[in-house]
Amino acid sequence: VMNCTWHPVQTLRTDDRQGRILTKLTENRISAICMHTNLDAAEGGVNDVLAQKLGLEGLTPLTEEKIGRIGTLKCEMPLVEFTRFVIESLGCNGLRYTDCGKPVHRVAVGGGACGDYIPQAIAAGCDTFVTSDLRYHDFLDTTELHLIDAGHFPTEDVICEPLVAYLQRAFPTAIVMKTAAHDCEAIQYCIKEK
C-alpha cells in the first residue's frame, strides 16, 4: 500500500497533525511518497496542468528552477472575462484580483503560493499572473500586471486527476488508485451583494 501526496514533509513529530498521520502510515507499513516542489517543477506537473487548464500555449518556465509557467492565450481577453474563465476552469469559490488596465494575453501561473515570483512575471513581459496566497502589499505594489489570487487549493488540485491517470498507466496491475474524498477547498467566501 502506498500513499501519494504533495504536502512537504518538514518534521516527523507526533505532536502535530502531519506527524500523527505519518506515524500512523508507518505503523501500518504504508509507504508514503511526498512530492511538493518537484511536482510543481516537473514536466506534466502542477504548473503545466494549471497552464493547460487556463488555455495557455507555448509554455516556458517562469523561474530558473522551473517553478511556474508562462504562456499565451489564443486570443486576448478582457480581464473580467478572464477572471470568470479562471473561476470556471479551476472550480474556485471566488478569487481576488487587481486590474492594471490591459487585456489578458501573456499569462504567468504558479500553483500554490508563488507571490515571490511576481518580479519574474513582470520581467518576462506578462500582463497577468495567476497564483495564490498573495499578500495585501503584493496587490497594492504591483501595477505592471494583473494579479489573480485563485486560491491555494484550486491552483494545485488540478494535478490530482492527471496524476492518478499517470500512475494507473505506469502501474496497470496496481490496486485501485483514487484521490482523497475529503480533500476540498478549506476557504469559503462571503461576498457582499450589490
Regions inferred by a protein language model and the residue ranges of each:
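Active-site catalytic microenvironments in core metabolic enzymes, especially phosphate/sugar-handling
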Residues: V1-K194
